[in-house]
């Protein structure tokens, strides 16, 4: 262990030497930059951009660019970065974590790498923990960037998409982590490219990086919405509709457990829901409810697939064990459809449209870096998850803060009384005190005790960031007493007031140890900034959460031996501090394992999400006709369906293929069982399924071509194709996210059966993803073939041209150009030239044949 520590320390020393060497190069430009006029210094930005375009790397530009920022900061802000700040800036440019103590000027440090990386023109995101800090830093540092010729944007949650787009198009964008994440998710839900707000993610510099990438790592960003009461009503309406159907209105394929409406069922649906065409693009969601209602009523069997509990809940029956599966629900809306069928309450659902964890969000940046005062304890996690090293930057002046050993009491009451006595003693001599708590309840309790003791004070609970920043700024004034939860006021320095140095500086009192050493170090770091004197003292009790969970019996026995009756007895020793830190390390290890497991699950979704989002982006940005892609989907759907049925009994297989063709490809009377037998050269022993695939593909191609002809322009065709694909993809993807959530909950229990839940999740989610792709292609096929396509005429705004793939317009014996049609050379199995979509023998050739 000692060897490992020695190696880490030596590595850090070696890294510091390299940083100092580069920092000296930056400093060597100081006189040259100081000699430049304002105009000459400002012109350097354009010069750097040109040199970058001509092939110089950012690393090569670094010494001179950093020197320009230093000189600019001196002229605009009245601040001149120290060498240690230059070193911190170099670490940030290299994509690592710079650990810089509180008060060492992290905000100014960031200006150098931000400026350098903005030169590329690809955008820099400066990420803060709240919007107040985003606005503050963008305003303060924005003066410098603007003076140097760079644009600065602030991305706030209250801004409109147009304002957000403008902010993201700036050279430098200030934002919170959550807002960048939500904008990314929303960008991947739009239908048109012009509605996207972000550019490709280039370089992110994260302030308080441990808070964002470690503490928030398990928190997923979710774009969702409660399913409205109207949606729940749709389950009931769809259920009421399918219960009116007869066996002639739908076709069931028993082996594959699929079901769909035939022509008479479609007609009834259009009448029931008052629609012109069920398979219009606008009705994609409705067809989903109808499909689920059909499955619920005619495929899912009560007491076999599910049971209704005495509490009126639908419980899934495990097909292998026969046991009910508590807590599991059928995905894709099927569970709600069964609830509607059985007349039990339809449980409200929240539909997740998109989600991502901070871990995977920030790993998408080309380069990621961060600043914090406390990152070394999480070095392994930064390296393993984000491929970032943690480099401790030396302080500009030696730290003079005195960190006292912990004080341990037997009860919470005794501990808090001791805290109040200590605060009172320091208040009376004028020394400012900052009391750190881990919970709002503790803050309120101590506040009440201080009121009773007659000690005026301020309370911060991390609710109003702007107000609290002003309070925390004054926490170093003579006689100030401030209570703060650990995160309250973070990002704002506490500067000492007049006469406070002589009183010992700011005293930080911790009312209990946090489960993370890093959070304790953050609290300590509020005191002793830039070489100022200060003190820190932690008060503990055996009733604290950490001590109850991990406190050793040895500590308890020592207290008992000292005086079991005196609760005010106190232990103060190095042994106690070591025991507490040992407990913290165990908790940190557990938390890291949990975050790592979250990432393993999310990595599976990440791979799938990237595929879907990339395909989606390709569709949105396509300037081409998407016919090849759609026809490929149709062909794969045909091949997949025919292959699936070919494994069944011959008669069943042909009927299944016929039902599919009628439901998804062509009008019902455009194909018959005899046609399939004829094309498939059916004998008692064989069927030529490949020939059937070719035949169905030709039929589908003809229907597709007729559908597209109903659109008048290339622009209209592309718009229709894009909307069709995106609506189906988004619908299926949101269902898939829900299904993955349910799968994750389910596989967690398999660990008890000696199965690796992660491996099970990876395997099953891959199969589900393949199924989703198949479902997307099927829905695109069906909607394309069956949609009633409208286009508003530009010349006659009020005239609406409406045609349908099922040929429900009156057919005249003339083509679209008014020319008479010659039927004499049309074969019986050819499509009728009138454009109805039916075979000639079933349309204008009916009398003849």
UniProtKB/Swiss-Prot annotation:
Chief localisation class: membrane
Membrane topology: Peripheral membrane protein
Cofactor section: Zn(2+)
Entry keywords, A to Z: ATP-binding, Cell membrane, Cytoplasm, Membrane, Metal-binding, Nucleotide-binding, Protein transport, Translocase, Translocation, Transport, Zinc
Top EC category: translocase
GO MF annotation terms: ATP binding; metal ion binding; protein-exporting ATPase activity
Binding site for ATP: 85, 103-107, 493
Keyword Zinc set for record: yes
GO process terms (BP): intracellular protein transmembrane transport; protein import; protein targeting; protein transport by the Sec complex
Superkingdom as given in the UniProt entry: Bacteria
Record localization: Cell membrane; Cytoplasm
Reactions listed under catalytic activity: ATP + H2O + cellular proteinSide 1 = ADP + phosphate + cellular proteinSide 2
A Pfam family per the record: SecA_SW
An annotated GO cellular component: plasma membrane
Family matches, as SUPFAM superfamilies: Helical scaffold and wing domains of SecA (SSF81886), P-loop containing nucleoside triphosphate hydrolases (SSF52540), Pre-protein crosslinking domain of SecA (SSF81767)
Residues the record lists as binding Zn(2+): 832, 834, 843-844
Homology family: Belongs to the SecA family.
NCBIfam families in the record: PRK09200.1, secA
Subunit structure: Monomer and homodimer. Part of the essential Sec protein translocation apparatus which comprises SecA, SecYEG and auxiliary proteins SecDF. Other proteins may also be involved.
Protein name, entry field: Protein translocase subunit SecA
Gene behind the chain: secA
